[in-house]
UniProtKB/Swiss-Prot annotation:
GO MF term list: DNA binding; DNA-directed RNA polymerase activity; ribonucleoside binding
Reactions catalysed: RNA(n) + a ribonucleoside 5'-triphosphate = RNA(n+1) + diphosphate
Sequence similarity: Belongs to the RNA polymerase beta chain family.
Protein name per the record: DNA-directed RNA polymerase subunit beta
Function: DNA-dependent RNA polymerase catalyzes the transcription of DNA into RNA using the four ribonucleoside triphosphates as substrates.
EC number per UniProt: 2.7.7.6
Enzyme class: transferase
GO biological process: DNA-templated transcription
PANTHER family, per database record: DNA-DIRECTED RNA POLYMERASE I SUBUNIT 2 (PTHR20856)
Biological classification of the source: Bacteria, Bacillati, Cyanobacteriota, Cyanophyceae, Synechococcales
Length: 1097
C-alpha cells in the first residue's frame, strides 16, 4: 500500500491543541488560583487581636519534584512538588515582625500530557459542568393553573436567595429554602426606606401591596424587620436586633461567607444591565432592587423581561482542574485557619514562629483526598491513544456540587441547541449516564469565565472573511447572531453562492439571503467530538449507531502491527500527536542516532536532544505501550515532526484496527444475529494479534509468628517446578509460564494452632525444632500464561515506600500474545459490532473473481434496520482505494460540494479503479458495488452478487480470554449459602426467576429441584451429593435449601408464628441438620425407596 493520501475536501482547518483544556486550567491555578486562595486567608488574627499571620501568596514557590515522571511511576510514588510560602507573624503590641518561609504541603503536578501521577498510577481530572452562579428567572404553575414567577440569586458559595410572587400579588423571599418572608421585611432589614425601594422600581404600584402587608404585620422600622428576619431564619432562638444585623451581614455581605465569584458578578451585571465592578463579589442593594424590578416586569409582562433556560450552555459553566483544585485548597486552608487560631491562643506569644503555627497536614490531606478519592479524579483510560485523549476532554455533570444520576431528568440529558459546536451531540455513554457525561466538540475551548466557546468566520455582505483568526463566541453571544452551517457552498473569493441560506438564530432555524448572515461555522467537523470525527461518511449513519461507533473506537486494542485506515477523515494525525503517545521533535535539526530505545536529534546550534522511547510498558488497562522509531539516521526533522509511532499508531496517524476484505453475505447461518465469520488468515498472519501485560504482586509481611520469607526453599514442591526461579526464589526474566507455575516463592510461619495435637506433644517434649512454614507462593492464575518481561523488587533498604507491615514487595510482569479467537468482539467504525462465531480455513471462504478469498463475512441484514449506511460507503471507497493503491481522506458532511456527493465520489473512484488494465471486473455498471463471488468449498458461484470491499475493522478489549470461566465447587455466600457470582470470585451461573419459569414450562421437575437445592444452597444435600458422586453411589434426595430457612427466620423475626408441617400436622425442625451428629443416618436415595414408600409420601 503506497502512502499517498488523497484529500477529498476544499479547505482544511487545523484543530486547536486538543489537551489545552487541561493544561491551561492547571497553569491558571499555578499562576493565579493558588495565590488568590492564599491571599484571601491572609491575615489570620487570634481571638484577642494581638497576633496577625500574613501569607505572602505571590511569593510562594515550588521545589523540584523528588522523582521525575517515569521514576514516580516505577516507585509507585506521586509526581508532586513541595510548596513553600513566605509567612509574616506580626505582634500588634510590640510591633515585632517575624518572617519565615514555611512548608505548606505537596502539590501533585500535571505531566506534559495533561495527567497526574498519584501513587504510581496515571489519573485524569475530568472537567465538570455545573450551573453558573448568577440570577435566574423561572415560572411555575400552581394547582389552579395560575402562573407565578420567581427569581433565584445563586452564588458561587453561600446562601441562595429566592424571590417569588403569589396569587395575591405579594412578593416574598426565601433564604436557603427556609420559610417565606415578606420581601419588604428584607428591604427594611437591609436599611432601605420605602422611598428608596419605590424610586428604583419601574412599576412601584405592584410593590405597594407588599409594603402594606408588612405594615399590617406591625413591621415598620429597621429593628422590627431585623427581629422578624432572625425569627424566621433561626426559629426557636431568642431574637435580638444585633443578632439579626449580624445574621444578615454574614449571610450576604461577608466576602468569606458569600461569594458570587467573577462569573456570578459578570452574569448578574449582564442580566440586570448593571455596571458594578468585577471586584465586588458580594450582594449589593442594587442587585436586590434590580432583581425585584425585573421580577415585577415579568409578572406584568412588560419591559422585555424574559425567562431563563437553565439547560442553555450560557447558564452552565465548566469547572476544570484548576478551579476544582482551588476549591479543594480552600477546604484545606479553612481547616488550617482553625488550627492556627488555636495555636496562637495557646502558645507563648514571644517565642511563636510562623513555622510552629502552620501545620501542613490539613492542606496535604485535602489535596490527597481530592486526587485519591474524588468522583472527578479518575483512573486514566489508556486502552489506546484515542481513549486517553477523549478521557481528558470529557465533561461530566456528576460529582460534588453537580447532579446525581437518580435526580437528573430528561431535560438535563437532552441535546440543547446551544450545544452546537460546543458539546458533541453524539458521544455519550449508553445507560444510566447518558447525557450526563459529554465530550467537548473538536474546535471548542473554555473561556476565562468557564463558558464553552466555538469559532466562526465573520461574514460581511455575503462574503466569508477567512483572513486572520476566527472569532470565538460563547452560547449567549451566539444566540443574537445569524449563524450559517460550515458546509455552505462558497466560491474561491468566499462569496456565498445560494440565494437563501439556512441559519440558526435565537435557537431556531430560518432562511435568509447571504447579506443577512453574520457568521459562518469554521468547519463541518466542529459540531462533533474527536472520536466521532474519525468516522468517515458519518452523515449517512443513524445517530445511535454513530454513538456506538464513537464509544467502541475507544475500546479498540492496540494491535501488534497496526495499519492506518484506507478511508479516513484527515484528523488521524492530530489525534495521534495530541494524545501524547508519539514523541515529537522539539527542534529543527538532523537525526544523529536511532535505536529501539532512543532517538537523538542535533539542532542547528549543535546541541543534542534525546527522546527516550517506551518499550513494552503496561498501560492502565493491561494493554501494551510500545514506541517504534519512524525516522532514520541522517534524516532532517522540523519542530513538531513525529519521530516514532506509539501503540495503535502507524506513520504518525492513529491506526486502531486493520483494513480487511469484507463481504456482506450470509454463510451457513454463522453470521446470524451479528455473529462474524472470519478467515484463518487473520489468525495465521497475526493481523489481529495484540500484546497484553499482566501485573502480579506479592508482599512479604511481618506476622505475629515472625516474618514471611521470599525464598527458593518451599516445602512439598518438586525441584522441576523451581527450575525457572533464581536463588532468591523469584522467576527469571524471559521465562515462559503456564497457569499454576510459581512466580515468586514465599513461605509463611505456621502458628501453633495449625499443628495437629501429636506434633504439639512432640514439640513440648523435644523443645523448639525447625519452625514449621506454609507455602504461600505467588502463582500464575488458572486461565493465564505468558512470558515474564519484567521483575521489580522493592525493599526498605533501597529507600522504597512500602505499605505498612511489608518488608519486601515483588512485582512480576507477564506479557501474552493473544491471537483473535472465537468469542472475541470485533467492530467497525459505524457501530457495527459482533462476536466471532467461527474461524474458517481460507480455502473455504468465498472468493473474488481473481481468486482472492475474503477475510470477513458480515450479515447484510445488519445494515437496513440499523440505518448505518456509512459502512457501505466506507466499504466501496476502501475497495476503490485499495485497487488504486492510495489512501483517501474524506471530511464528513460533504453536501456543500453538491447533492448526493458521497455517492458520486465513490462511484467515480470505483470507475477509475476499474479503468486500470486487467481490473475491469472491479466495477459492474449493472450491479454497481457488487461482485459475483464463488463458494470456496465447491467453486460454484453464489446466486446473487455480493457487496465486497475493504473496511477498517477493530478488535475490542472485550476479549473472551478475560471472560470465559467455569466453576466446579467453590466459595459460597455467608448468609444465603448460594454460590458467589462473577469470574473473580470463582462464581457460578445464576439461575434466575425467568430461567425457573422455562424449566417449569417443560415440566423438568427433577432438573429444577437439583438446581434449586444440591447445586445451590442445600448445605447437607450438596455435601452428600459430592460424596455420593466420588464413591459412585446413587445421589440422595435433596433437603431444605438454606435460603428457605433464611426466609422463615426473617418472617419469624417479624413476630409471625410460621413453621413447616408434614401432612400429619407434625412440625418439621428445619435446624436439625445444622449440627448433624455423627449418628444421624444419611438421607434415603431415590433408588432405595420402593414404590410403597412413594405411596406413603
Amino acid at each position: 500500500m503506497s502512502s499517498s493520501a488523497i484529500q477529498v475536501a476544499k479547505t482544511v482547518t487545523y484543530l486547536p491543541d486538543l489537551v489545552e483544556v487541561q493544561r491551561a486550567s492547571f497553569k491558571w491555578f499555578l499562576d493565579k488560583g493558588l495565590i488568590e486562595e492564599l491571599e484571601s486567608f491572609s491575615p489570620i488574627t487570634d481571638y484577642t487581636g494581638k497576633l496577625e499571620l500574613h501569607f505572602v501568596g505571590s511569593e510562594y514557590r515550588l521545589k523540584r519534584p523528588r522523582h521525575d515522571v517515569e521514576e514516580a511511576k516505577r516507585r509507585d510514588a506521586t509526581f508532586a512538588s513541595q510548596m513553600y510560602v513566605t509567612c509574616r507573624l506580626v505582634n500588634k503590641e510590640t510591633g515585632e515582625i517575624k518572617e519565615q518561609e514555611v512548608f505548606i504541603g505537596e502539590l501533585p503536578l500535571m505531566t506534559e500530557r495533561g495527567t497526574f501521577i498519584i501513587n504510581g498510577a496515571e489519573r485524569v481530572i475530568v472537567n465538570q459542568i455545573v450551573r453558573s452562579p448568577g440570577v435566574y428567572f423561572k415560572d411555575e404553575q400552581d394547582k389552579n393553573g395560575r402562573r407565578t414567577y420567581n427569581a433565584s440569586v445563586i452564588p458561587n458559595r453561600g446562601a441562595w436567595l429566592k424571590f417569588e410572587t403569589d396569587k395575591n400579588d405579594l412578593l416574598h423571599v426565601r433564604v436557603d429554602k427556609t420559610r417565606k418572608i415578606n420581601a419588604h421585611v428584607l428591604m427594611r432589614a437591609m436599611g432601605l426606606s420605602d422611598n428608596d425601594v419605590v424610586d428604583k422600581l419601574r412599576h412601584p404600584e405592584y410593590y405597594k401591596k407588599s409594603i402594606e402587608a408588612a405594615n399590617d404585620e406591625g413591621i415598620s422600622s429597621e429593628d422590627q424587620a431585623l427581629l422578624e428576619l432572625y425569627k424566621k431564619l433561626r426559629p426557636g432562638e431568642p431574637p435580638s436586633v444585633s443578632g439579626g444585623q449580624q445574621l444578615l451581614q454574614t449571610r450576604f455581605f461577608d466576602p468569606k461567607r458569600y461569594d458570587l465569584g467573577r462569573v456570578g458578578r459578570y452574569k448578574i451585571n449582564k442580566k440586570l444591565r448593571l455596571t458594578i465592578p468585577d471586584s465586588v463579589r458580594t450582594l449589593t442593594h442594587e442587585d436586590v432592587l434590580s432583581t425585584l424590578d425585573y421580577l415585577i416586569n415579568l409578572e406584568l409582562d412588560v419591559g422585555g423581561a424574559s425567562l431563563d433556560d437553565i439547560d442553555h450552555l450560557g447558564n452552565r459553566r465548566v469547572r476544570s482542574v484548576g478551579e476544582l483544585l482551588q476549591n479543594q485548597v480552600r477546604v484545606g486552608l479553612n481547616r488550617l485557619e482553625r488550627i492556627i487560631k488555636e495555636r496562637m491562643t495557646v502558645g507563648e506569644t514571644d517565642s511563636l514562629t510562623p513555622a510552629q503555627l502552620v501545620n501542613p497536614k490539613p492542606l496535604v490531606a485535602a489535596i490527597k483526598e481530592f486526587f485519591g478519592s474524588s468522583q472527578l479524579s479518575q483512573f486514566m483510560d489508556q486502552t489506546n491513544p484515542l481513549a486517553e485523549l477523549t478521557h481528558k476532554r470529557r465533561i461530566s455533570a456528576l460529582g460534588p456540587g453537580g447532579l446525581t444520576r437518580e435526580r437528573a431528568g430528561f431535560a438535563v440529558r437532552d441535546i440543547h441547541p446551544s450545544h452546537y459546536g460546543r458539546l458533541c451531540p453524539i458521544e455519550t455513554p449508553e445507560g444510566p449516564n447518558a447525557g450526563l457525561i459529554n465530550s467537548l466538540a473538536t474546535h471548542a475551548r473554555v473561556n476565562e469565565y468557564g463558558f464553552i466557546e466555538t469559532p466562526f468566520w465573520r461574514v460581511e455582505n455575503g462574503v466569508v472573511q477567512k483572513s486572520g483568526d476566527p472569532i470565538y463566541l460563547s452560547a449567549d453571544l451566539e444566540d443574537e447572531c445569524r449563524v450559517a452551517p460550515g458546509d455552505v457552498a462558497t466560491d474561491a473569493d468566499g462569496q456565498i453562492l445560494a440565494e437563501l441560506i439556512p441559519v440558526r438564530y435565537r435557537q431556531d432555524f430560518e432562511k435568509v439571503p447571504p447579506e443577512q448572515v453574520d457568521y459562518v461555522q469554521l468547519s463541518p467537523v466542529q459540531v462533533i467530538s474527536v472520536a466521532t470525527s474519525l468516522i468517515p461518511f458519518l452523515e449517512h449513519d443513524d445517530a445511535n449507531r454513530a454513538l456506538m461507533g464513537s464509544n467502541m473506537q475507544r475500546q479498540a486494542v492496540p494491535l501488534l502491527r497496526p495499519e492506518r485506515p484506507l478511508v479516513g477523515t484527515g484528523l488521524e494525525t492530530q489525534v495521534a500527536r495530541d494524545s501524547g503517545m508519539v514523541p515529537i521533535s522539539r527542534v529543527n535539526g538532523t537525526v544523529t542516532f536511532v535505536d529501539a530505545t532512543a532517538i537523538v536529534v542535533r539542532d542547528e546550534e549543535g546541541y543534542d536532544h534525546t527522546h527516550f522511547l517506551q518499550k513494552y510498558q503496561r498501560s492502565n488497562q493491561d494493554t501494551c505501550l510500545n514506541q517504534r522509531p519512524i525516522v532514520r539516521q541522517g534524516d532532517p526533522v522540523i519542530i513538531g515532526q513525529v519521530l516514532a509511532d506509539g501503540s495503535a499508531c502507524e506513520g504518525g496517524e492513529i491506526a486502531l484496527g486493520q483494513n480487511v476484505l469484507i463481504a456482506y453475505m450470509p454463510w451457513e447461518g454463522y453470521n446470524y444475529e451479528d455473529a462474524i465469520l472470519v478467515s484463518e488468515r487473520l489468525v495465521n498472519d497475526d493481523l489481529y494479534t495484540s500484546v497484553h501485560i499482566e501485573k502480579y504482586e506479592i508482599e512479604a509481611r511481618q506476622t505475629k509468628l515472625g516474618p514471611e520469607e521470599i525464598t527458593r526453599e518451599i516445602p512439598n514442591v518438586a525441584e522441576e517446578s523451581l527450575g525457572n526461579l533464581d536463588e532468591m526464589g523469584i522467576i527469571r526474566i524471559g521465562a515462559f509460564v503456564e497457569s499454576g507455575d510459581i512466580l515468586v516463592g514465599k513461605v509463611t510461619p505456621k502458628g501453633e494452632s495449625d499443628q495437629p495435637p501429636e506434633e504439639k506433644l512432640l514439640r513440648a517434649i523435644f523443645g523448639e525444632k525447625a519452625r514449621d512454614v506454609r507455602d504461600n507462593s505467588l502463582r500464575v492464575p488458572s486461565t493465564e500464561r505468558g512470558r515474564v518481561v519484567d521483575v521489580r523488587i522493592y525493599t526498605r533498604e533501597q529507600g522504597d515506600e512500602l505499605p505498612p507491615g511489608a518488608n519486601m514487595v515483588v512485582r512480576v510482569y507477564v506479557a501474552q500474545r493473544r491471537k483473535i479467537q472465537v468469542g472475541d468482539k470485533m467492530a467497525g467504525r459505524h457501530g457495527n459490532k459482533g462476536i466471532i462465531s467461527r474461524i474458517l480455513p481460507r480455502e473455504d471462504m468465498p472468493y473474488l473473481p481473481d481468486g482472492t478469498p475474503v477475510d470477513i463475512c458480515l450479515n447484510p441484514l445488519g445494515v437496513p434496520s440499523r440505518m448505518n449506511v456509512g459502512q457501505v460507503f466506507e466499504l466501496l471507497m476502501g475497495w476503490a482505494a485499495a485497487n488504486l493503491d492510495c489512501r483517501v481522506k474524506i471530511v464528513p458532511f460533504d453536501e456543500m460540494y453538491g447533492p448526493e456527493k458521497s455517492q458520486q465520489t465513490v462511484q467515480a473512484y470505483l470507475k477509475e479503479a476499474a479503468s486500470q488494465p486487467g481490473k475491469d471486473w472491479i466495477y459492474n455498471p449493472e450491479d454497481p458495488g457488487k461482485l459475483l463471488l464463488r463458494d470456496g468449498r465447491t467453486g460454484e458461484p453464489f446466486d446473487q452478487p455480493v457487496a465486497v470491499g475493504y473496511s477498517h475493522f477493530l478488535k475490542l478489549v472485550h476479549l473472551v480470554d478475560d471472560k470465559i470461566h467455569a466453576r466446579s465447587t467453590g466459595p459460597y455466600s455467608l448468609v444465603t449459602q448460594q454460590p458467589l457470582g462473577g469470574k473473580a470470585q470463582q462464581g457460578g451461573q445464576r439461575l434466575g426467576e425467568m430461567e425457573v419459569w422455562a424449566l417449569e414450562a417443560y415440566g423438568a421437575a427433577y432438573t429444577l429441584q437439583e438446581l434449586l437445592t444440591v447445586k445451590s444452597d442445600d448445605m447437607q444435600g450438596r455435601n452428600e451429593a459430592l460424596n455420593a458422586i466420588v464413591k459412585g453411589k446413587p445421589i440422595p434426595r435433596p433437603g431444605t435449601p438454606e435460603s428457605f430457612k433464611v426466609l422463615m427466620r426473617e418472617l419469624q423475626s417479624l413476630g409471625l408464628d410460621i413453621a413447616v408441617f408434614t401432612d400429619e400436622g407434625k412440625e418439621v425442625d428445619l435446624m436439625q441438620d445444622v449440627n448433624p451428629r455423627r449418628s444421624t443416618p444419611s438421607r434415603p436415595t431415590y433408588e432405595s425407596l420402593g414404590v410403597a414408600d412413594y405411596d406413603e409420601d
